[in-house]
């Protein structure tokens, strides 16, 4: 997993309280990790803060899995 992927995983574990081994690229935030819509909004805000970038609403709607978040942030992260 990339350095950005590891940071994404850490945020997901902290915010959703899931076991680290469940946080894999194909894991759906809602279906696999038990997030609700508020959790997903909070995750997006945490990603924005951690990586110093803005995630527009239309992009946030396409970030459904851990891998989606990692790919988006690898392209758009400022830090």
Swiss-Prot record:
Record pathway: Lipid metabolism; fatty acid biosynthesis
NCBIfam families hit by this protein: acyl_carrier, PRK00982.1-2, PRK00982.1-3, PRK00982.1-4, PRK00982.1-5
Lineage: Bacteria, Pseudomonadati, Pseudomonadota, Alphaproteobacteria, Hyphomicrobiales
Its biological purpose: Carrier of the growing fatty acid chain in fatty acid biosynthesis.
Keywords in alphabetical order: Cytoplasm, Fatty acid biosynthesis, Fatty acid metabolism, Lipid biosynthesis, Lipid metabolism, Phosphopantetheine, Phosphoprotein
Record GO cellular component, one term: membrane
Single GO molecular function: phosphopantetheine binding
Pfam family, one: PP-binding
Cellular compartment(s): Cytoplasm
InterPro entries, per the entry: ACP, ACP-like_sf, PKS_PP-bd, PP-bd_ACP, Ppantetheine_attach_site
Organism this protein belongs to: Rhodopseudomonas palustris (strain HaA2)
Family as reported in the entry's similarity comment: Belongs to the acyl carrier protein (ACP) family.
Modified residues (O-(pantetheine 4'-phosphoryl)serine): 37
BP term (GO), one: lipid A biosynthetic process
Source domain of life: Bacteria
Protein name, as recorded: Acyl carrier protein
